[in-house]
Amino acid sequence: TGVSLEDIESATFERFPQLATRRKQLAGTLSGGEQQMLAMSRALGTNPRILLLDELSMGLAPIIVKDLYQIVHQLSQEGIAVLVVEQFARTVLGVSNKAGIMINGKIVREGEPNELEEQLSAAYLGKKSSNS
């Protein structure tokens, strides 16, 4: 890719400052959130046009989830397309510019996050929304 290891490391620690203090630690000894940050930084080191994230929040503390989704939002602002599969859809809607709801492997709704918010609430509560 023409990017030096030092540049990748510098960009990683700028985006994920928590990892800088853990630079000598084995990856397997990092916390769950730090392991997610490390996985994201590995992927970002390849300068992707799209980043796929599957259940980013799984097993993580809410404050870590918030931090990770702020990074997802920043990546989107930088022009990287980010596709997130997330069981806790509201978490993703706050940082998305387009979203879809999938049920049983099929996309049943697509649109702007604010449009889907009401439909999501209705789906959780088993009610029909005004947009159904």
Please describe what each predicted stretch is.
Residues 86-87:
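H-loop/switch region of ABC-family ATPase nucleotide-binding domains
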Residues 14, 101-110, 115-132:
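C-terminal boundary and immediately downstream tail of ABC-type ATPase nucleotide-binding domains
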Residues 55-56:
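Walker B catalytic motif
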Residues 43-44:
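ABC ATPase C-loop
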Residues 47:
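Conserved catalytic motifs of ABC-family nucleotide-binding domains
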Residues 26-30:
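Conserved ABC ATPase signature
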